């Protein structure tokens, strides 16, 4: 399938008004963001009539990068475990791409027992880490954990639809 990348920049701002003006009355299946505060409202304010069915996704690469930073700069060994698990999703997505899977076939793979095992492992580890005293974690690790927890549904929305991407790297690399 042909992939489309749109880069939009207006008056030096990434604010809400820029996004809502740009989107106008477009009908979108999904929109992916990086968790930037101005875009968090997508789940609420943009759920007007034309956006009520729009799926808000958050880029998995951004989540993974937070754990990489927590491991490398924060010295958090458990951050590596999260990063390795999140990378499993990327590995699986590359395999689906290489196999030329249709969106229906991709969805079946995303719904597989192996995928569910990874999700359960990540969620269990996340809950266990969040239950620990925060003063014993680095700032980077705390940020990564809270990001993953806060955007859990948006990060894993791709698992429920074979057409949705796992990340917005295509747009990031334009």
Regions found by a protein language model. Give the residues of each.
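Catalytic center-proximal scaffold of phosphoryl-transfer enzymes
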Residues: 1-174
């Amino acid at each position: 399938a042909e992939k489309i990348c749109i880069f939009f920049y207006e008056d030096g701002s990434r604010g809400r008004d820029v996004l809502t003006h740009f989107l106008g009355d477009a009908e979108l299946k999904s929109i992916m963001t990086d968790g930037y505060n101005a875009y968090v409202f997508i789940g609420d304010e943009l759920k007007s009539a034309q956006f009520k069915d729009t799926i808000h996704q958050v880029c998995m690469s951004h989540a993974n990068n937070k754990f990489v930073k927590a491991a490398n700069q924060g010295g958090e060994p458990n951050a590596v475990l999260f990063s390795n698990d999140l990378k499993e999703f990327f590995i699986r997505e590359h395999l689906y791409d290489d196999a030329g899977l249709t969106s229906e076939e991709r969805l079946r793979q995303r719904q597989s027992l192996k995928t569910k095992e990874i999700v359960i492992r990540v969620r269990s580890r996340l809950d266990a880490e969040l239950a620990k005293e925060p003063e014993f974690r680095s700032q980077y690790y705390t940020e990564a954990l809270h990001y993953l927890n806060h955007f859990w549904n948006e990060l894993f929305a791709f698992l429920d639809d074979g057409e949705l991407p796992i990340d917005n790297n295509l747009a990031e690399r334009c």
